[in-house]
Amino acid sequence: GGVLKDTIQMIHGPLGCAYDTWHTKRYPTDNGHFNMKYVWSTDMKESHVVFGGEKRLEKSMHEAFDEMPDIKRMIVYTTCPTALIGDDIKAVAKKVMKDRPDVDVFTVECPGFSGVSQSKGHHVLNIGWINEKVETMEKEITSEYTMNFIGDFNIQGDTQLLQTYWDRLGIQVVAHFTGNGTYDDLRCMHQAQLNVVNCARSSGYIANELKKRYGIPRLDIDSWGFNYMAEGIRKICAFFGIEEKGEELIAEEYAKWKPKLDWYK
């Protein structure tokens, strides 16, 4: 979630729990890197753990929206302490949304002890999102070819580079999950004709659910490396029946980069 460019990421727990966030990664965005500039935490103290942290969370959510008046979307995460004391973050989120009708909040209840690996957190967010948020919004479709690009997080700007390829092919990306993406675009994932998965470990779950619930096919690619990327472009173009466009794009990119690649030989 921390890669989204228009969303407050609220970590409900002690300040230290907010350390391992997008600030340890390289997730730029095309709106001035909003997601990399700020860390939000409820900064729970011992008294909040003893007496409950729900009021602290509610106050922090309102403060964040007040400080960021242009931002209307938020994801709230539990941590080990807030999960152990049983804070009902979903109830708090509903109350804040009632108080602020123009905002939308998603909650992720996956404290660190939930699973043996990071993948558990991916699974909880993937399934929670499709259960609660997908198909709660519709966007304008401007192309006869549409897809979701899933499991790419714009590390060092790769999502933005790949977007130039999709634009040249005439493919509309309904939603990026989640590199350089937006909260509301992800609510429209049901509108795509194809789910292209780049990182299956983190995001294959939601692609599988979209196929099960909406009949959207899943296509796995690997975008790292010239030959792998060319293979991925061919697979996507074959699905849409635009193979000629794909070959033109691949030829243009090879011609552009071949002299530099040859240097390494």
Swiss-Prot record:
[8Fe-7S] cluster binds at residues 17, 80. GO terms for biological process: nitrogen fixation. Binds 1 [8Fe-7S] cluster per heterodimer. Binds 1 [7Fe-V-9S-C-homocitryl] cluster per subunit. One of its GO terms (molecular function) is nitrogenase activity. It catalyses: N2 + 8 reduced [2Fe-2S]-[ferredoxin] + 16 ATP + 16 H2O = H2 + 8 oxidized [2Fe-2S]-[ferredoxin] + 2 NH4(+) + 16 ADP + 16 phosphate + 6 H(+). Gene3D superfamilies: Nitrogenase MoFe cofactor biosynthesis protein NifE, C-terminal, Nitrogenase molybdenum iron protein domain. Its EC number is 1.18.6.1. Its cofactor is [8Fe-7S] cluster; [7Fe-V-9S-C-homocitryl] cluster. [7Fe-V-9S-C-homocitryl] cluster binds at residue 199. Keywords: ATP-binding, Iron, Iron-sulfur, Metal-binding, Nitrogen fixation, Nucleotide-binding, Oxidoreductase, Vanadium. It is an enzyme of class 1 (oxidoreductase). This vanadium-iron protein is part of the nitrogenase complex that catalyzes the key enzymatic reactions in nitrogen fixation. Belongs to the NifD/NifK/NifE/NifN family. NCBIfam families: alt_nitrog_alph. The structure of the 7Fe-V-9S-C-homocitryl cluster is assumed to be analogous to the 7Fe-Mo-9S-C-homocitryl cluster. Hexamer of two alpha, two beta, and two delta chains. PANTHER family: NITROGENASE MOLYBDENUM-IRON PROTEIN ALPHA CHAIN. This is Nitrogenase vanadium-iron protein alpha chain. It comes from Azorhizophilus paspali (Azotobacter paspali). The gene is vnfD.
